[in-house]
Amino acid sequence: MAKGFTVKADVPKKKAAPADEFSIEKAKELIRGKTVVFCLPGRGVSYIFLKAFVQLCFDLVQSGAQIQISQDYSSMVNFARCKCLGANVLRGPDQKPWDGKLKYDYQLWIDSDIVFDTEKFYRLVYMDKDIAAGWYCTEDGKTTSIAHWLEEGDFRKNGGVMNHETLESMSKRTKPFTCDYTGFGWVLIKNGV
């Protein structure tokens, strides 16, 4: 530095990252003493799924939750979901899950191709909503499982397809939001809904 000069400057201030309101400890408090029924439609899973599922089960039990598993298969996924709930089409439309005989606080639906971890589960719990879903990409890698209704004219213009969120639009979202449609691949439902 040149003789006679003194540099006086403040350290540049870092912009604070937006605070994530999520607290895993609060989510653990919400789930303590509760029963979660894992609803698993399908025939088989990958080792990636299996490792994540076993870890989630372990973490929930360690947090003081109880777990149950309801798994069934049909080539028609909507029927497989009904079977997971113990439903029977011959008993009509007014049925309760497992005929009301299974005591539970939450149903957690996980499709066999979903990649997840325990934190993602706790984020659903932390929302404390009747229905909370996580999003995931569909097979094209660009469209997501989340959609919004369109006005009838716009629906026709869109080829009869709802207005789905894209990978790009979801990357801009930082907080939970309301949607009109969600896939059932990763969804948490409270008892009584």
What is each residue range found by the language model?
Residues 65, 102, 127:
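Structured loop/turn residues at beta-strand edges in well-structured enzyme cores
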Residues 52-55, 83, 123:
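Alpha-helical elements of Rossmann-like donor-binding domains used by nucleotide-donor carbohydrate transfer enzymes
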